[in-house]
Amino acid sequence: MAWEQQCRSSGLFETTLDLWPASASPDWLWCLGLPLLTEAARDQTQRHLIGLSALPGCGKTTLGHWLERAAQQLGLPLQVVSIDDFYFDAERLDQAMRGNPWGVPRALPGSHDLPLLCQTLSRWKRGEHVDLPQFDKSLRQGRGDRCGWRSCAAQILVLEGWFVGCQPLLPGESIEHGGEHLSPPIRPDE
């Protein structure tokens, strides 16, 4: 209740609702936004990584913008980075996506620079200052490219994207039979 009062008295809702589509219910704020901020505010003496995984187009980036703005207003040292910012640069991205059966320029597993992502997150977790890559999807006629770096010294880092936390099938496992992490196994109609 104290958290709710702090959010209401700070004007958080009025100053940040413009980041969310007008047609969307503000219930998302109470059910998702505030619980994430509550978790972020819990212990600011150590660095905490929060993963946010959801399907493309459902509002992860919009929520991330809201979280950063709300956290700034509340004095929380929170920053959001998208897994999309860790796409390979243009040349490597084109090589990685060449011949994919869907003909898409990015987004599939294999289009992200996972060593850079892991190295960056490990360095950040150890307390080091890191620079996060930025990716602009509008460059190269919508195929996208890296477009610079931004500084990150936040105590709380939210990593948003799809496939965040997903594990690949192990050798010998199949979608039909599942793996230990697929329970129950996926049916053909799924």
Predicted segment positions?
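Charged, amphipathic alpha-helical linker segments immediately N-terminal to NTP-binding catalytic cores
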Residues: 1-31
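Conserved nucleotide-sensing/catalytic segment adjacent to the nucleotide-binding pocket
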Residues: 20-21, 79-82, 86-140
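Pre-Walker A adenine-sensing motif
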Residues: 31-43
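The Walker A (P-loop) glycine that initiates the GxxxxGKT/S ATP-binding motif of P-loop NTPases
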Residues: 54
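Walker A (P-loop) phosphate-binding loop of P-loop NTPases
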Residues: 57
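Conserved lysine of the Walker
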Residues: 60
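Hydrophobic positions on the alpha1 helix immediately C-terminal to the Walker A/P-loop
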Residues: 63, 67
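ATP-dependent NMP and nucleoside kinases share a basic, alpha-helical "lid"
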Residues: 143-190
